[in-house]
């Protein structure tokens, strides 16, 4: 028998054999991992679905790090959603879950301890605030949490949420995944507080699944002390120009040395801009950061997701579209998303990823455009209609207007000043006041010939520019061409995906009586010329109006579908009124607030309007759906898809009228809708549900109920005959010296139009 201790050669051979076997084992494991990933639709490092990480719980709604914010995650998110806790230390070394070492923004501490504001160097910058290190935990039991982002509801601040410890969150909620983030390890060390000691101590009773920090030294110090069974270490990147304190390198520089990070971390957490850079709020080409990190064996988690944050214009104010661009773009998937709204992240992962362009519809309702895709382009232009068709609209609409020479065309308003640059044009002198239309002066479509209107530039409408300074797609704010009704009908007829068109006819009585223009005849004649009346096209035609007299006139002269629009917000409708509507209309349009009444942006209940109208076999279409989060009640979590789901699946409406057809069309292909067990993030919201968790002192005031729609609201006199028209004239630009009949220069009108032009330019064309 050979003694290996006495035979060095055999010893080396045996060691080589073990090394060889180890290499084979590693290769086999790598091959298995690659095979697992290649079979998965996910292009994450492991092939698993991206992780949903709830920053401070559901902090987009409830105060960050409150117990309710954390507990709400399990009720609204995918199984396995991870709770994120920003760990702060108190003076007596108790670990808290609190969003920052500075306390003023997210609590009422300045009210409780007004004289205990201090100043410290934080990341090298002198900073004044109330710091956790100046208070024992007992002191902080008197402090309550509040919403730290002003664009979010403060109604829940009155719930007196206390500050929770790390142990509280773990023991009371038992999260499936728990992520601790240590943002200021060096700062605590400077004040004789050891974050490492706290974490090692708490890990004996609390399971820590992930541990992140933006400081390299933190991982160097704690890494070997946790051992193999410790949490996953994730290095957190700050902005590219920020300097990492222990290496004195910028984070942008560290992003180019991923192999170094792999020596102590299994993953990296980066701001979204490392992956999708943005310039002037538009996306630049995506980087190779995710692929590079995956090659280095690092998982990539993306941060900075919030439904109410400023999104790139490319996403059309749709947070779901942003999530999908980071996980389902054909090139890579991030391994996790850090979000204030885990519900939206969950639905992106589980319901809307990997649908493909040919995914079939899972729910039956009509997606009807509102002036085309008017959230992305100026309404009623060729670009808005083309995008609406491309985005999956079932029906495109034309808001009918008439030019002075009797040409019917599509434009969102009869007042050209609301959607064109007319007040900056040579036609600005054609302003007039029409009491039948509005109390303020305007430049109306019937004051210009079609050839003159075509010289104007369209203007995108910005419904939230004044109150919220939110502007739509500024690069395309004046793009596109105006579309005649004839061109609109031909565009629709030549589309293979559309099922129909909707033509909205308003102000017909005024146009007949005062302008000698017959909108009804113009529509019918154009439909005939375009081949819609002789069945040469199968495209469905719907005529909409708020006037029963208009629809009755159409019914007498054609067989097109008619749609009655209830202009007012109502809470109910009499059966007799429905019976009257049924005589001349095939469907009804109502507002969102007529389905879900609101008070101070909270839903207060649900009416029975949809159910009552449908009982009389009248389909119900609801308007107007927008992506901007400020257009939605808090109950819908700043997510247009949640709002659509609650109206379609919850209220049972038959169609959405939307300025962003893509959002509604994508919802129709939602893979979660046909499951036996619908996940919580795809269950319609409970009307007035949020009000049940608002403290009585913070409840919004009761509002006067909306009216009940009656027979009298429906009944109208018939349309008047068309008056004789005066000879058509096309006055040119007015000189500054033109005299009025009394010999005075029209200074007052010029001043009025100048002010009108200034307001228009500031609101629409900035």
Curated annotation (Swiss-Prot):
Q: Which reaction equations make up its catalytic activity?
A: a sn-glycero-3-phosphodiester + H2O = an alcohol + sn-glycerol 3-phosphate + H(+)
So what EC number does this one have? Answer: 3.1.4.46
What PROSITE patterns does the database record attribute to this sequence? GP_PDE
TM spans (from-to): 746-766
- Please note every region of biased composition (Polar residues): 726-743
The record places domain GP-PDE at 50-349, 365-668
Chain spans, region Disordered: 704-743
Q: In which tissues is it expressed?
A: Expressed in roots, leaves, stems, flowers and siliques.
Instruction: Tell me the membrane topology, using the record's own terms.
Output: Single-pass type I membrane protein
CDD domains hit by this protein: GDPD_SHV3_repeat_1, GDPD_SHV3_repeat_2
Glycosylation sites per record = 105, 192, 248, 257, 314, 358, 429, 494, 507, 534, 547, 654
Provide any one GO MF term from the record: glycerophosphodiester phosphodiesterase activity
Q: According to its record, what are the GO cellular component terms?
A: plasma membrane; plasmodesma; plastid; secretory vesicle
> Which locations, inside or outside the cell, does it occupy?
Cell membrane
Topology, Extracellular side: 36-745
Q: Look up the signal peptide feature and give its range.
A: 1-35
Q: Name one Pfam family in it.
A: GDPD
BP terms from Gene Ontology: cell wall organization; glycerol metabolic process; lipid metabolic process
List, alphabetically, the SUPFAM superfamilies matched. Answer: PLC-like phosphodiesterases
Taxonomically, which superkingdom? Eukaryota
Similarity comment: family membership: Belongs to the glycerophosphoryl diester phosphodiesterase family.
Q: Name the PANTHER family on file.
A: GLYCEROPHOSPHODIESTER PHOSPHODIESTERASE GDPDL4 (PTHR43620:SF11), GLYCEROPHOSPHORYL DIESTER PHOSPHODIESTERASE (PTHR43620)
Query: Its function?
Result: Involved in primary cell wall organization. Required for the accumulation of crystalline cellulose.
Record-given protein name: Glycerophosphodiester phosphodiesterase GDPDL4
Species per Swiss-Prot/TrEMBL record: Arabidopsis thaliana (Mouse-ear cress)
Identify the coding gene. GDPDL4
């Amino acid at each position: 028998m050979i003694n290996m201790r006495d035979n060095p050669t055999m010893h080396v051979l045996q060691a080589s054999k073990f090394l060889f076997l180890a290499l084979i084992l590693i290769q086999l494991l790598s091959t298995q991992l690659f095979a697992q990933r290649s079979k998965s639709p996910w292009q994450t490092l492991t092939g698993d679905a991206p992780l949903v990480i709830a920053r401070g719980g559901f902090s987009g709604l409830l105060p960050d790090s409150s117990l309710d914010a954390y507990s709400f995650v399990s009720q609204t998110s995918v199984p396995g959603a991870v709770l994120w806790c920003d760990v702060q230390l108190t003076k007596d070394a108790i670990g808290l879950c609190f969003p920052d070492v500075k306390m003023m923004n997210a609590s009422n501490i300045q009210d409780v301890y007004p004289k205990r504001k201090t100043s410290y160097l934080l990341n090298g910058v002198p900073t004044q605030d109330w710091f956790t290190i100046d208070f024992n935990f007992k002191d902080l039991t008197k402090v309550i949490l509040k919403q730290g982002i002003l664009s979010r509801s403060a109604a829940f601040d009155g719930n007196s949420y206390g500050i929770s410890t790390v142990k509280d969150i773990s023991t009371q909620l038992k999260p499936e995944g728990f992520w601790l983030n240590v943002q200021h390890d060096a700062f605590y060390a400077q004040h004789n507080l050891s974050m490492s000691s706290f974490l090692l101590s708490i890990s004996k009773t609390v399971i820590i699944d992930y541990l992140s920090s933006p400081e390299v030294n933190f991982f160097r110090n704690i890494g070997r002390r946790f051992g193999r069974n410790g949490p996953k270490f994730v290095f957190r990147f700050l902005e590219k120009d920020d300097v990492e304190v222990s290496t004195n390198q910028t984070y942008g520089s560290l992003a180019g040395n991923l192999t170094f990070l792999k020596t102590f971390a299994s993953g990296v957490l980066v701001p979204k801009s490392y992956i999708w850079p943005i310039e002037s709020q538009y996306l630049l080409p995506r980087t190779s950061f995710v692929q590079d990190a995956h090659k280095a064996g690092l998982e990539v988690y993306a941060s900075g997701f919030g439904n109410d944050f400023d999104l790139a214009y490319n996403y059309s104010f749709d947070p779901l579209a942003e999530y999908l661009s980071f996980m389902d773009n054909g090139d890579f998937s991030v391994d996790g998303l850090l979000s204030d709204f885990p519900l939206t992240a969950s639905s992106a992962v589980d319901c809307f990823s990997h649908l493909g362009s040919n995914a079939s519809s899972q729910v039956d309702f009509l997606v009807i455009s509102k002036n085309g895709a008017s959230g992305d382009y100026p309404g009623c232009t060729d670009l808005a209609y083309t995008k609406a068709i491309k985005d999956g609209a079932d029906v495109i609409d034309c808001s009918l207007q008439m030019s002075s020479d009797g040409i019917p065309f599509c434009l969102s308003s009869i007042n050209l000043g609301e959607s064109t640059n007319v007040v900056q044009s040579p036609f600005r002198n054609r302003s007039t006041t029409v009491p039948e239309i509005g109390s303020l002066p305007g430049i109306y479509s019937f004051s210009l010939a079609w050839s003159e209107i075509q010289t104007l530039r369209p203007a995108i409408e910005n419904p939230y520019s004044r109150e919220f300074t939110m502007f739509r797609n500024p690069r395309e704010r004046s793009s596109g061409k105006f579309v005649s009704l004839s061109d609109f009908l031909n565009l629709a007829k030549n589309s293979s995906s559309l099922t129909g068109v909707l033509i909205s006819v308003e102000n017909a009585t005024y146009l007949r009586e005062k302008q000698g223009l017959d909108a009804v005849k113009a529509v019918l004649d154009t439909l005939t010329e375009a081949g819609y009346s002789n069945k040469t096209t199968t495209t469905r035609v719907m005529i909409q109006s708020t006037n029963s007299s208009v629809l009755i006139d159409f019914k007498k002269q054609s067989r097109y579908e008619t749609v009655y629009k209830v202009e007012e917000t109502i809470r109910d409708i009499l059966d007799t009124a429905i019976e009257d509507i049924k005589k001349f209309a095939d469907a009804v349009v109502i507002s969102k607030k007529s389905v879900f009444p609101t008070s101070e942006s909270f839903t207060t209940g649900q009416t029975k309007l949809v159910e009552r109208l449908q009982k009389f076999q009248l389909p119900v279409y609801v308007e107007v759906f927008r992506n901007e989060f400020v257009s939605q009640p808090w109950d819908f979590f700043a997510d247009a898809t949640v709002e659509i789901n609650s109206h379609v699946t919850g209220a049972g409406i038959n169609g959405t009228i939307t300025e962003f057809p893509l959002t509604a069309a994508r919802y129709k292909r939602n893979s979660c809708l046909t499951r036996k067990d619908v996940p919580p993030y795809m269950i319609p919201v409970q009307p007035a549900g949020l009000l049940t968790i608002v403290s009585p002192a913070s409840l919004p005031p009761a509002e006067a109920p909306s009216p009940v729609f009656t027979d009298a609201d429906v009944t109208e006199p018939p349309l008047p005959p068309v008056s004789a028209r005066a000879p058509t004239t096309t006055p040119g630009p007015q000189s500054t010296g033109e005299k009025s009949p009394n010999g005075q220069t029209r200074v007052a009108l010029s001043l009025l139009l100048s002010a009108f032009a200034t307001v228009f330019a500031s609101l629409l064309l900035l």
